[in-house]
């Protein structure tokens, strides 16, 4: 694994107390190399905006716009064969509203034949209690996948190890012109102080036919005993047909062509191209990679951005096939990408 590094390492302690020697500034120059290789062409359903979900509605829908109450909430992009799904959203309760927010990922088969979706690897965790954010050493061994900080960290670790979490079946089959659920899980906040929780999900799947996918948000419903229950398939279907984009929205991104001034990358909601970056790292013009001399160093950037190339002029962000106008222009950070 390569670590993201800057071309210069600077160590300095500001605002030193009186009578304490001013720390020495140490500059260690090093080479910043372009990472060879490229992303593959596997599409990624990437649902991360709005990150903080305060209201019910559509988070990301690739369904057709036709016959929907809010056409602008749908991106009209089907999937077939291999594709990935990445979602990350946060729920936050209020002083008088601690209802459990559910995230649902619904799939529709528009064809005249049954479609089977094989769930190759998949994991979904909440930050509390599954994977809290904790302080960790800069480097730590993780041979069996029990070291993580945050739900995204744990989900990615499982998928890279070829695991499929127990909450996911090996496959689902969807009848012609019918719906199915890939995910219907809570983001509980009721017992937390403060009442904030997040869920990260990463799935690698293969579909035998064409399908549409949507990531949705609904609060738990009440059963006849007054207890919370998960939304039903029919209730999720209704969100697809009549729901609008969940609000409030995240910050609108800075236009991608803007190269100066303040910068907002924005959060991703759409379909990106590229699930895996494969590279053979060698010295320029050679077939091998030599270690630097004693005292020397070189680095490769990981997840470099259009305005954060660290001097390499290389933008590694996955391109968006479809997106909402108020969300990120590219999949900045390449979340969930191997």
Labelled PLM ranges:
Residues 134-191, 338:
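Intrinsically disordered, low-complexity Pro/Gly/Ser/Thr-rich segments with frequent PxxP/GP/PP motifs
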């Amino acid at each position: 694994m390569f670590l993201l590094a800057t071309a210069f390492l600077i160590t300095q302690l500001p605002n030193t107390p009186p009578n304490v020697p001013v720390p020495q500034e140490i500059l260690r120059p090093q080479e910043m190399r372009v990472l060879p290789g490229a992303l593959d062409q596997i599409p990624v359903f990437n649902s991360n905006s709005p990150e903080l979900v305060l209201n019910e509605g559509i988070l990301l829908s690739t369904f057709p716009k036709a016959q929907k109450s809010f056409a602008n909430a749908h991106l009209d992009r089907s999937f077939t064969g291999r594709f990935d799904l990445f979602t990350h959203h946060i729920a936050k309760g209020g002083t008088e509203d601690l209802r459990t927010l559910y995230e649902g990922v619904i799939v529709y088969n528009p064809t005249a034949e049954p479609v089977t979706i094989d769930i190759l690897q998949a994991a979904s965790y909440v930050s509390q209690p599954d994977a809290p954010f904790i302080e960790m050493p800069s480097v730590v061994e993780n041979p069996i996948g029990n070291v993580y900080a945050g739900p995204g960290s744990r989900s990615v670790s499982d998928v890279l190890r070829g695991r499929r979490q127990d909450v996911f079946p090996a496959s689902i089959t969807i009848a012609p012109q019918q719906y199915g659920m890939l995910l219907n899980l809570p983001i509980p906040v009721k017992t937390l102080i403060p009442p904030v929780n997040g869920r990260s999900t990463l799935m690698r799947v293969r579909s035998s036919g064409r399908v549409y996918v949507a990531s949705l948000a609904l609060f738990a419903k009440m059963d006849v005993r007054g207890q919370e229950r998960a939304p039903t398939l029919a209730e999720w279907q209704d969100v697809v047909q009549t729901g609008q984009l969940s609000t409030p929205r995240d910050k609108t991104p800075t236009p991608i062509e803007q190269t100066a001034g303040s910068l907002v990358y924005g959060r991703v909601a759409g379909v990106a191209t590229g699930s895996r970056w494969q590279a053979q790292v060698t010295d320029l013009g050679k077939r091998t990679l030599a270690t630097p001399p004693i005292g020397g160093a070189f680095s490769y950037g990981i997840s470099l951005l259009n305005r954060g190339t660290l001097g390499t002029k290389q933008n590694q962000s996955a391109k968006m096939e479809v997106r909402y106008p108020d969300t990120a222009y590219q999949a900045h950070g390449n979340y969930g990408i191997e």
